[in-house]
Amino acid sequence: MVEVSLTVGKLDASLALLLTKDHHLIEFPTILLPNGVRAGSIIKIRCDQDFDSEKEEAEKFTKIQDEILQTFATNLPQPPNLKIKNVTQTSCVLEWDKLNLGTATLKNLILFKDGKKLGSIPQPLNNRTSKLSGLPIDKSFKVQLRLDTTAGTFLSNEIEVTTHKMTDLSGITVCLGDLTPNDQFNKEDIEEALKNMGAKYPVQQQVKVDTTHFLCTRENKQNPEYVKANDMNIPIIRPEWLKACERERRIVGVRDFYVKDCVLPDIFAKNYWQKTTSQTAGNFSAQSLPKESPAVPDKEGLPKTDLNKESVKDEPTEVDHAKEDSVTQEPAIEEISAVVSENIITPDIANEETDIVEGESTKIESVPTDEIDTKVESTPVAVETEDVVAESPADQDAAVTLEPTSVDDQELHQSDETLKQVNDGQQEIDVGDATEQPEKEEIDDIREQVNSTVNNTERQETATDDAFDTVPLEGDENIATAAKETEPTSTEPTESVNVTNVNNSASEEAGKDDNDDEDDEDEDADNEGKSNKTSEQSSEGSATGSPSKKKNKKKKKNNKKK
């Protein structure tokens, strides 16, 4: 303990100045001075150390410090535990445990994707899930949470998420709504379909964050789950969508299965829930396949037989066409051969026909050998006579006369071709019968007679042409009567042409160069038929007669040499 004697130097209301013996000045509060002290008074001050009170204070302090340490230093916030709740083709649902903040307070909870901030979780103390939508199909990415508190920041574990493929149906989570009692399915059928698909079952009764589809058959806005699904933008569809996915073995679009917009007849037509019929059909097909297996080759063989039949049917048609072509050519040859045989066997009949010709136009002796060509050429020559007769009234109808001439020319060419075939056959016969010299001599004599008759007929034709030309110019009755007399002679060119054809055919039998001569004579005959209107054309017709004589003479000489 220390005792000090001090002298009060000055006394104030708050402070007093005390002086020591060593003349040190000490300020001392006046409130601690005893009562009645004034300036010049001497006082004594004693100072002691209180060890007991010091211990008590120390114990109190340590106790308070321990409490602070245990309250704020030992209970720290825990980092969040992040988990995957559900994954689909385009979405992911994340889940984490309840946050343990300790004695700290929460500032923020942030979600990161591949190191990039996606956003803050709303109401982090209440929400423990988060859904990410609009993700790419079959892609991988990393997700992490960061917890910000007054005690510091804490990072969660990093999770790698891979979205599903279109064929992976394990992410489908269904919530079941209202079903009508008349439906073809029930809750057990839906759960069985989910099981076959590989989706999550049993079905949910309440809409949650991981609910992907809400199944019902009718709209019921009184149902809170229906309203919640509508608010959460969850597709509200019919249960047939599950069967469609089960059939396709892949996720199917929900557009055709919306409860609001679906077309029920189209859905019912597909018979998604007919299990008995499908099973019975499968069993029936499995039983019938081994029985019908031997019949398969027979069915496959049928088309082959049909093809063969068709090919067989096609072949006779080609053969028939060939036969028809050959048959059309053969009758002409058969008729000509019949005519030849008739001429050889019955010369009397031929003589009668030649007599008829002599009675109508000019007197021509009958020749049995040359009548072969006269009969064959009778039809085209008759056509030429029609041309001659038709050209007489050409002043009235010129257009009418032109049409049949084109048809007649075609018939003449066809008859000429048949005559050439017959003449070729006859030439071969004549070559084979070279020993028959007397017959050739008789033929030469007949040719001379025919040439003389041809000259007479040509003169008559020129006369008739002149008569027709002079009728419209002169009005005399004598000329009209002459024209009338010429009318019956209009038939004479028909027969005279026949004679020329006889002569030509006979000449064709004799030599090999007859084909060229026939062409020239046919052209001359056509020119003569068309020259009825003008005298100049008639003169050309007479000019064509003179070269025919020269040709006939040459042919005679050749025949005599042979």
From Swiss-Prot:
GO terms for biological process: ascospore wall assembly; cellular bud site selection; chitin catabolic process; conjugation with cellular fusion; Golgi to plasma membrane transport; regulation of DNA-templated transcription. It holds the Pfam family fn3_2. It comes from the Eukaryota. Residues 534-547 have a biased composition (Polar residues). Residues 548-562 have a biased composition (Basic residues). Residues 297-326, 410-419 have a biased composition (Basic and acidic residues). GO terms for cellular component: exomer complex; trans-Golgi network. The keyword Transit peptide does not apply. Residues 514-526 have a biased composition (Acidic residues). Residues 488-508 have a biased composition (Low complexity). This is Chitin biosynthesis protein CHS5.
